[in-house]
Amino acid sequence: MHNHGGEIYGHHYRLDYSVNVNCMGTPESVIRAAARGAALSARYPDVNCRELRTALASFLNIKEDQIVFGNGAADVIFSAILAWKPKTVLVPAPTFAEYEQAARVVDARMEYYILKEENEFRLDRGFLDELTPDVDMVFLCNPNNPTGQAVEKDDLLAIADRCAENGIFLVVDECFNEFLEEPKAYSLLGELEKYENLMILKAFTKTYAMAGLRLGYGLCANRAFMEKMAECSQPWSVSIPAQFAGVAALKETEYVAESMKHLRKESIFLKGELIRLGFRVYDSRANYIFFKAAPDLKQACGERGILIRDCSNYKGLAPGYFRICVKKHEENLELVRVLEEIVNG
């Protein structure tokens, strides 16, 4: 059974801090577009996502045949694994669990590069030494989930070069990239055509609060690999509502700009309050905060109607590590009030 954030079904929580979607909510234009798509539910979706493909290629300034769509980023991860069929997969740890879930489908052996707490769980240059010819595939979440740490472009290029030298396929998960203060400084999007062994993973889920619509995509300049991915993907995996919603979302530039402005301000506020309450707070760069507290904090919050993400099931983490998303100020004030109540007994 998968264990992720957002486990609200069958429970009654008044505030869900366990999922990292944009707290500003789904844009109204996206909701209306999805509704128009739902009205066409008697039809099969466009298997090639033509309108969405054209809009996204223009938005990212890339070629249309460099995009593969999926039913969320997780769907693209599984398709990439099935297409490459790696025998050995390397990931930093802790990181997003879905990479390992997908690797199990092809019975790949997992290798982990354990990130050190004394280094704030940052990926260091020692990772390059692990990129040897016996590794077939690498997944790199940037910024990382759950730690929020981000790898800068110079280091990403060094990793991509080493992977290219040793025949390793590199998947860089940039699903949280838009939440960084300078997204381009932490992205390989501009280097897509330089590396045939590179795929960038992105989704509409987090930035546009579209988790329930399921729309993710992979970007890659290797045409043969993209064709293989298409063979490994189920047809009609992207619904009409999701395709319509994606086209509408790409027009919401003002919504994204305002969201990022709010999230950065509230992230500073929340980090400061967590530190004031005595928690060990790490340098998370995205729309969530990674921190250390008493192992029973999730239970204590749950008893007060608030769900937070217990990270103890992540490889490389012991009990006592948690992740919370950044929400609107009124909600963040309530979280702080509850945490203060717990701390003060």
Short names for language-model regions:
Residues 111, 117-182:
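Active-site phosphate-binding strand-loop segment of PLP-dependent enzymes
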Residues 1-43:
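N-terminal "arm"/small-domain region of PLP-dependent enzymes with the aminotransferase-like
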Residues 303-304, 313-345:
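PLP-dependent enzyme catalytic core of the Aspartate aminotransferase-like
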Residues 49-89:
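Phosphate-binding glycine-rich loop
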Residues 25-30, 197-282:
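PLP-dependent aminotransferase class I/II
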Residues 83-104:
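Conserved PLP-anchoring active-site segment centered on the Schiff-base-forming lysine
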Residues 63-67, 167, 174, 196-197:
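Short acidic capping loops at alpha-helix termini that bridge into adjacent secondary structure
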